[in-house]
């Protein structure tokens, strides 16, 4: 019995050895053993020895990945967080199943189809499995609403829920801001629709494209985004297999923003498809790259079936920027060091990058065997290094603030802001002083910060941002936080100088 690939008649001595070993273990081993599990583990170990981006993906994992990349799943249309051991609704999708049923941000879901969800230390996947299901099936929920101190029941019919990958708003006069969170199947359409909406009442002359923390996605999606920025035929990227088969991808001169000033924001977690976009724009001198050196992933993967619903995400080719540069960083020191280096990219100035033992990617051209280059896309304008301890403090503080906001809003829902989104954005942060004082009183004994007053402005602004998210959606969160964002400030300064 053959347990490993006998593809197209390939039958090497090593493959014979492996199949013989599997058969011996199955038929002659002294104890019963799950041979399928053993083969599964050995397959995973084999794949792990290839490169950092090849991976075994189980049927269950693949389903989750496909939902994210397809841009739709079947559920009840909420985002949630465990706060004080209870499942708290963070946001409700507009016109989604939960909004139609009358669910609000801040509501606590206590029971789903008879299963209690509180005081169980459940992880997100366990919770999701109870809320998701087949389209038009019903989930019975018991919900607690703090504002009226009541528990009530709702029957919610599961439906298709879109997963947005694009956030957009008018940054300032004649200037649009578009955040792309991943390159999914529908990202290109989302981008075009968002741009056209921005362009409706006033022609957009400047565009800030935010690719920070974008891990990549579908290569074709990145190509279609690049295609929006050029008025003549230009190279987007080149791919090449180990056998030297090379494909070149070009723009089509059919984009929605072929003229105008383009600024792309990147950081050390901008990877893969994000780097395709940044590299094409930079090499073709179409725009300005602002930020930190990018991740450095210049390898292309394909999903190939393994059987049983599992797939191998296998690296099948390299890609090069239009000028012929490879951006792939070395992984000769192992996968752990490879990802550690990536995590440090936001915390080193360019002259300190050499301490990471990586060279400049510009030295690597087609067919180069040199794996020890720096990798990534180097920005045209570099943003000053981030302080790790400051970012950790902000991360802890943000978690405290979000927990507070959802609890506070639920307790004060009837007395809170009733105006428009525009009016909300124009509110002074002093409007949130009462909430700030309450937050400070609740958290002053937590020893995480010597004096919360030192962060007063940041806390007030964050309270405003997270309240805005609950009231008006994710765009408001970006609009408020971007007001004090260093990358955005540099982009605006560049626009004003142009």
State where each predicted segment sits.
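Cleft-lining beta-strand/loop regions that shape enzyme active-site pockets
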Residues: 5-14, 26, 30, 34-35, ...
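Interdomain regulatory linker/hinge segments that flank or connect interaction modules
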Residues: 16-68, 147
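PDZ/PDZ-like peptide-tail recognition elements
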Residues: 52-91
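Membrane-embedded segments
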Residues: 85, 97-100
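Structural motif
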Residues: 106-108
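Acidic, polar loop-rich interaction surfaces within structured domains
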Residues: 268-271, 279, 286-289, 295-296, ...
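Conserved functional hotspot residues or short segments at active or partner-binding sites
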Residues: 326-498
